[in-house]
Amino acid sequence: WWIGFLLFTIVGERLELSQFLPVPSWSQNALKSLLALFTVGLIVPFHAWGNEIMGISALLIAAWLLVFDMAKVASRKAAQFRYIGIGLQVGYLWLGIHGLILMGLGNHSLSYALILHTFFLGFTFSMIWAHAPIIFPTIFGIRQTPYHPVLWITWTGFQLSLLGRIVSSILDEYELRKVLGVANGYLILIQFVLMAGIIIGKIMKGGTSSQSGNKIYREGRKKILH
């Protein structure tokens, strides 16, 4: 149910933003139908096709987001907007991998870990990293955005270590899985520390601003779209 809550929250926000793009109405209805199908999968027991229903719906939701979401627009821009766009698209790929695991690896000895890690680490944390440059100023009421090109280093390390963690789990390489799991956890902490350091550095360098976080969010969204 936590997976369902986060999925509906994130996808609902992306669906709302899609109104600013020329997205056909049929595709929006299709996404709503896929979310309804995912809900059915949550209700049906996992041993009675529940996992498979959630898996196929998660895979198709990921495909919808890759095709229709504004991330494809942002990824063609520069600096932080490229970071946001690529981060979102990678998150959607993780959602697709999550769906594939639900459909095909339900009997694996580490299936529970694979399901949790692909969703909560792969999909959810990718969403956090991608939204941070616009959402964090809104949350903390500041103008400074937590973006610097150095974030690409830890972001890439996080994604690669998580991918290695998933592959080593599937192959039952427990020692490698353990090492990559520790690295993955530290990279999450480092990413947050870097973001905090970037904000503090920008505040000390340029001072505070009276511009509200909500205004930053609105301007950021406009820049992504135009």
What label would you give each PLM region?
Residues 1-226:
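Hydrophobic alpha-helical transmembrane segments of multi-pass integral membrane proteins
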